[in-house]
Amino acid sequence: MAADSGRCGAGQLVDKYGSALFRFCLVMLRNAADAEDAVQETLLRYIERSPEFESAGAERAWLFTVAANRCRDTLRAASRHPQLTLDELAGLGAEKSELGILDALMNLPEKYRLALTLHYVEGYSTGEIASMLGRTPSAIKMRLKKGRELLGKEIFDGE
């Protein structure tokens, strides 16, 4: 059971956030092994630092911010693994109807992929994303707009 402070234990943390963090990292990194590493490092940082949060939303935002930073670090490093194929995505439980969108999303530049995933997949507002990424809300709105345009081109030009 979690402590009275509302802080999650390791098992509860994985149950509560593990799947969402993995999806997020998988879209960012396009590689299951790297995504697993990023999630593990994110959760380990949480356990090591024992941060206190005012709300579950603040805790979730902190975890996604740390995960985004881990993903960026991984993307900066030399590629260790090839990108996921559509067959590998299907093997990881993605529905066939989602594969085209996931593939298109994974082909976008990182800054658009990150904004679109945080907003549309994880449900963060533009203000929350701006705070997480150290950008202005208007910059995030522009990234979302441009990202949607690029995603549309990626989906419809690929047919």
Where are these regions (language model features)?
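A short, charge-rich alpha-helical start-of-domain segment used by transcription regulators
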Residues: 1-23, 36
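Sigma70-family region 2
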Residues: 2-4, 30, 41-58, 77-79, ...
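C-terminal flanking helix
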Residues: 22, 43, 109, 113, ...
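Structural recognition of an alpha-helix C-terminal capping motif at a helix-to-coil junction
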Residues: 23, 37-44, 57-69
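Arg/Lys-rich amphipathic alpha helix in sigma70-family domain 2
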Residues: 48, 54, 64-84, 146
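DNA-recognition helix of helix-turn-helix
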Residues: 68, 72, 133-158
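Internal acidic/polar
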Residues: 73, 80-105, 125
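A short pre-motif secondary-structure segment
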Residues: 115-119
